[in-house]
């Protein structure tokens, strides 16, 4: 079973899911909104595009050269 495919179909059924994962590429590819936590503190939330553009997320979590 392809879990990514299942997750992509959940919004059509008006269902949501909470994913906790360190694989940012896979997670941002299937989510509508993301919440980024660093050292127990919420540092950013928004659409995948907003997360990718967030300077603090880049500095703390992704690095400047991160690309999807």
Swiss-Prot record:
A cellular component term, taken from the record's GO annotations: cytoplasm
InterPro entries (alphabetical): ABC_AA/LPS_Transport (IPR051120), BCA_ABC_TP_C (IPR032823), P-loop_NTPase (IPR027417)
Subcellular location: Cytoplasm; Cell inner membrane
Membrane topology: Peripheral membrane protein
Keyword Phosphoprotein among record annotations: no
UniProt-listed Pfam families: BCA_ABC_TP_C
Function statement: Part of the ABC transporter complex LptBFG involved in the translocation of lipopolysaccharide (LPS) from the inner membrane to the outer membrane. Probably responsible for energy coupling to the transport system.
Protein name (Swiss-Prot/TrEMBL): Lipopolysaccharide export system ATP-binding protein LptB
């Amino acid at each position: 079973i392809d879990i990514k495919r299942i997750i992509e179909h959940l919004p059509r059924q008006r269902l949501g899911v909470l994913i906790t994962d360190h694989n940012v590429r896979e997670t941002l590819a299937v989510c509508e909104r993301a919440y980024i936590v660093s050292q127990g503190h919420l540092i950013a939330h928004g659409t995948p595009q907003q997360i990718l553009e967030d300077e603090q997320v880049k500095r703390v979590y992704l690095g400047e050269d991160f690309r999807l």
